[in-house]
Amino acid sequence: MGFLLSAEQVLQFVTNQWQDPYAVLGPQQIEQGETSFWLVRALVPNAKQVWLVERATGQAYPMQPLHPETLFELCFAPGTPVPDYFLRAQRVWDPEGQHLEEWEDPYRFPLEKVNHIGELDRYLFNEGNHHRIYEKLGAHPISVDGVQGVHFAVWAPNARNVSVIGDFNHWDGRQHQMKRLGESGIWAVFIPGVGPGAVYKYEVKTAWGDIYEKSDPYGFQQEVRPKTGSIVADLHTYTWHDQEWLEKRAATDPLRSPISVYEVHLGSWMHASTEDPPADGHLVPVEQKPNTRFLTYRELADKLIPYVKELGFTHIELLPVAEHPFDGSWGYQVIGYYAVTSRYGSPQDFMYFVDRAHQEGIGVIVDWVPGHFPKDGHGLAFFDGTHLYEYADPRKGEHKGWGTLVFNYGRNEVRNYLIANALFWFDKYHIDGLRVDAVASMLYLDYDRKEWIPNCYGGREHLEAIDFFRQLNTLIFKYYPGVLSIAEESTAWPMVTWPTHVGGLGFNLKWNMGWMHDMLNYFRMDPWFRQFHHNLVTFSLMYAFSENYMLAFSHDEVVHGKSHMLGKMPGDLWHKFASLRALYGYMFTHPGKKTLFMSMEFGQWNEWNVWADLDWELLQYEPHAKLRHYVATLNQLLRSQPALYTQDTKPEGFRWIDCSDHRGIISFIRYGEDPREWLVVVCNFTPVVWPNYRIGVPQRGFYRELLNSDAVEFWGSGVGNLGGKWTDDWPYHNLPYSLELCLPPLSTLVLKWQPPQLAEDSGENKAMLE
């Protein structure tokens, strides 16, 4: 039941101090004594005249102003119902009435009828357990009584008033005010006539009267930087073709599968000229590189995916593709967690990219940043005039070194925002894994802080973040079995990849940062001095099976003056390439899944520069082209040899032959689950040829050389074992048989045992038998 407005109430309403516009605007039934009549109110800022137009007859009824150029009202005679109508207005900037505006009155649709956020939704959200809240909050195109529009909803519990602003209302927050839904802190409104592609923001009026214009935290798309508006997007318009891939993924144990990841920053992998615009016209220039543009998601699908498939990688890992305002952050300072960045195209374009990858047998992993967010005014910071998403105390809620804010993991709605976001990427974009950034910064309350607040037990462990990770990973694997949840955790925090029910964090992989640092420190040394630091090569096997590890040479290792991979290797050109091949060979035979950053596959000299694309011209030179061929060969070896992946996380999958040869040589065996699947690996990290090097082996027979990193085809010297070696009946290294090998300089050898009878019957070995 409606009511007549006093002058004071009119002033409150037109100054956005009302929390239920539906009680004032639209059709209102008024009762005065025994008399009952209907009236319609409309808030139209900067209107010279407003009409209510009866749809059936076209009759226009002028509305009377209750407040100059803002609030208008039309009363109907008692007993006269409100007809089906729309509104028409003449704005003050159109004195001649040449450009009248017409629109559907959003407030003629009762919110109870159009609102799809029920009491259960609000309860689960406030409890922190609404796993698909992204289907409720944000902007969602819907149809009501045949009228197309968008349902907007946002969480801002401490705001005095919230409105939707956009081109459709001249960015005036008075026209489309939202209604507060009970005590949930959620505000909602249905705006007819708005559809996909419309740019909008939320105008948030704080309790202190300040007004902020905020992007939608749950928005599915945003404008290309430097613009900051959200864009209405319908994520249901793309038709997927990857059902077979998804079914196979759900039935596969990734820990027993070959995983080799190509880490990519989409904005700097490859560029195009602005004189060669994309077919869809979505041309976004690269900052600091004139006459150059980004490739679109669809162009990347045509170029990047075939490239990755040719090299044999199993997955592509994308540096963050959630919307971020600053290119120089590499994507790690996210504003729109639910919006795939518009730099490279639309949400449907990104779906196409993932779909194409799946059709080519390649998984897609996305870097995810729940540890912090930037302070940009249009983002999450101080969202409703209070520290809503972040901790209020800067000793807990701010990363001084990064200039960013920390999510309040103890607040139900914030935790829900992040966990639902992780599930959203699997649900809507069919991704195959998340690589969670900067986990250590979340686990420790004193991480990079001089002043910090201890937990309730006096310790430095961030208990709320620990609970967050456990809930996150439990839900990821509940809904999406077979996917990856990878932790970038740079400390020795225990049980990162252990199940949550035994006290672990629940990830299924963790980057092995210790192995990476040890190996880079070792290979930086002159080979002569490596003999004095042999422990750097072998130490990783002391803990290799305490977690499920991924060996990663990531983007962080080729920036900020660290030099690129070749630049880390000592010696002349030949020795640099030989050392890098030996390192990659050891990496691909060492227990653990693999990750290489883009450009490492062909040996770029320059450090990674986010403003430039890769130095593709290097591939015209033989050493670089053959290094790329070598990486492709390693990937093919990994895929074809179960001994290299089925027991990556089990101590049964590894045995040292000799780890104590301080001349810089190691040898070991990798075992598959099938007892007949095993490989012998020998690494010579010195520039010396060892022509009569003997190692012990467990079985008599012929050992075929599957890989020699010093082969001529890889730009090596060609020293080797002529395809393989027969065993000698001499025990060695506490094993019953032995091989006498010729070890090439700076090399990795991989040999596969063949039983004597099989070897003798093999045509490729007849010459050696003779």
UniProtKB/Swiss-Prot annotation:
Q: Name one GO biological process term.
A: glycogen biosynthetic process
Keyword list, A-Z = Carbohydrate metabolism, Glycogen biosynthesis, Glycogen metabolism, Glycosyltransferase, Transferase
Entry's NCBIfam families? branching_enzym (TIGR01515), PRK05402.1 (NF003811), PRK12313.1 (NF008967)
* Superkingdom to which the source organism belongs: Bacteria
Binding partners and assembly: Monomer.
Reaction(s) catalysed by this chain, per the record, are: Transfers a segment of a (1->4)-alpha-D-glucan chain to a primary hydroxy group in a similar glucan chain
Select a single GO molecular function from the record's annotations and give it. Answer: hydrolase activity, hydrolyzing O-glycosyl compounds
Could you say which protein family the record assigns here? Belongs to the glycosyl hydrolase 13 family. GlgB subfamily.
Q: Which HAMAP family match?
A: GlgB
Its protein name is: 1,4-alpha-glucan branching enzyme GlgB
Documented EC number(s): 2.4.1.18
- Catalytic residues of the enzyme: 437 (nucleophile), 488 (proton donor)
Q: Name one Pfam family in it.
A: Alpha-amylase
Functional note: Catalyzes the formation of the alpha-1,6-glucosidic linkages in glycogen by scission of a 1,4-alpha-linked oligosaccharide from growing alpha-1,4-glucan chains and the subsequent attachment of the oligosaccharide to the alpha-1,6 position.
Q: Which InterPro entries match?
A: A-amylase/branching_C, Branching_enzy, GlgB, GlgB_N, GlgB_N_E_set_prok, Glyco_hydro_13_cat_dom, Glyco_hydro_13_N, Glyco_hydro_b
Q: Pathway listed for it? A: Glycan biosynthesis; glycogen biosynthesis
